[in-house]
Amino acid sequence: MTYTHGHHESVLRSHRWRTVENSAAYVASRFVPGARVLDVGCGPGTITVDIANRVAPRRVIGIDASADVIDQARRDASGVDNVDFATGDVYALDFPDSSFDVVHAHQVLQHLPDPVGALREMRRVCKPDGVVAVRDSDYAAFTWYPDEPTLDVWLALYRNIARTNGGEPDAGRFLLAWAHAAGFSDVEPTASAWCFATPEDRAWWGDLWADRMTSSAVAKQAERDNFATRAELEEMAAAWRRWAAHPDGWFAVLHGEIICRP
């Protein structure tokens, strides 16, 4: 698996912002005291820690493929005594069958060459009366105002790179189909969105994407593999900052969501 975004500070900045409230509200009612939860692809662990606070005293486990990110998650969660972080492989989870009440993954399947296989493995470690809960964005459904033609170029570039890396940037719309292919028959599909429209939210969202387009793994791959020149990437960054500075700027990120019962 290639994680297209990489782990530049501009990427982790957005990951650290994520909580149950803004990223897992669709399954929040399952995070009750005593529930055993596995957070797959946990990144720096802010959602994981939020879950841990809700299910205490039960321990929560967060896994990620990146050892560096797991080390950071452990540092950031120091003082939280009911959370464990470990490196792990979503295709070969190191847990017995029927181990968890909730197996959760946020923005993970879009980066995997075999999302159906990952869902099958998540299903294996889920208890018979538990759920597998997945949320992924749908890049083709991103919507913004005002029109900024260079952002159209940015979106096409990112989707091209993500697919070159074996992922599916429009994963949100495929989640239900992938769940059915993985053998789930009882699936609750929903959708929700992040909206960035206040001056503060626009500045945060625009700046992190501007930084990504000049400094993250996406930018490095774009130059290395001739998807874009440095000048083109800098123009994309400038377009993000123009959008963020516009008093009427508005950006919506659509997410598909599924709650699957084994």
Segment roles from a protein language model:
Residues 1-19:
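Class I SAM-dependent methyltransferase Rossmann-like catalytic core
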Residues 17-33, 50:
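Conserved alpha-helix/loop element of class I SAM-dependent methyltransferases that forms part
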Residues 38-40, 44-92:
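Class I SAM-dependent methyltransferase SAM/SAH-binding core
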Residues 91-102:
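A short acidic, Gly/Pro-enriched loop at the edge of an enzyme's catalytic core
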Residues 101-114:
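A short SAM/SAH-binding and catalytic strip from SAM-dependent methyltransferases
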Residues 116-131:
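A short glycine-rich, Lys/Arg-flanked "PGG" loop and its adjoining helix->strand segment in the class I
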Residues 133-202:
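Conserved catalytic/acceptor-binding region of the Class I
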Residues 186-262:
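Conserved Class I S-adenosyl-L-methionine
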